[in-house]
Amino acid sequence: MEFAHLTVLSLFCLAFVGITATSSGEDYWQSIWPNTPLPKTFSDLLIPSGKTNSLPIKSEELKQYSTLFFEHDLHPGKNFILGNTNSVGSIIRPFTKSRQGVTDSIWLANKEKQSLEDFCYSPTAIAEHKHCVSSLKSMIDQVISHFGSTKIKAISSNFAPYQDQYVVEDVKKVGDNAVMCHRLNFEKVVFNCHQVRDTTAYVVSLVASDGTKTKALTVCHHDTRGMNPELLYEALEVTPGTVPVCHFIGNKAAAWVPNHTADNLCVM
């Protein structure tokens, strides 16, 4: 599998987790990527009980995941207001099951309507590879196995809290067909990792209305024939299979891509 070259900037680094290396998962991380702090996105995987006391994606954060737009909208000066569709239930499964199975927005699970089995044991689409992991070691093993190398990087978003109006400052292409790992929206800590086919990933630098600068991982789907037609029409007034469609990825997910530089693993 070939990926586009990833230019790594220090500004793409996630806030790092200030914890000591006491868990076997973090020790395993350090054994593969020495002196590399654990990304905040994956910190839930270190919770001893494997269960939190609340859902990881708060109601005010849902807009990070429910914003659809065109690929040609990704340019400096473009204004975005998060949440241009009210059909959160459709965002959960933006593709029809008959064509692409459970895909890249499954982390928006409503625990009262879906179960982990719906996401982790449902049939996969043709050429789709997915795994549910509940430990940091399992995630590391899965992505290394997929790429056949430890020279990989994880990239994520850092949307500002309580901000939903942004202006694009810069756009950088990350690569094609990345492996996405999403924190499922259940109290039990589970990430769903899968390859996103026929897509291009970008890192978009944004400036919030209060001046806060953030970065957003963005995925553009080039094959939208299996997309939910009602969702597409509500958000963009287009039909499936006509134009590429993009969406932001919220703070509780990351994209794994090859590391073509000599830098340490670096994530936004």
Curated annotation (Swiss-Prot):
Residues 1-25 form the signal peptide. Seed. It comes from the Eukaryota. Keywords: Glycoprotein, Repeat, Secreted, Signal. It is found in: Secreted. It comes from Vicia faba (Broad bean). This is Embryonic abundant protein VF30.1. PROSITE patterns: BURP. The lineage of its organism: Eukaryota, Viridiplantae, Streptophyta, Embryophyta, Tracheophyta. The BURP domain located at the C-terminus has not been identified in non-plant proteins. InterPro entries: BURP, BURP_dom. One of its GO terms (cellular component) is extracellular region. Its main location: secreted. The USP gene family consists of roughly 10 to 20 members. Glycans are attached at N259. It holds the Pfam family BURP. The keyword Disulfide bond does not apply. Residues 68-259 form the BURP domain. Coiled coil: none annotated.
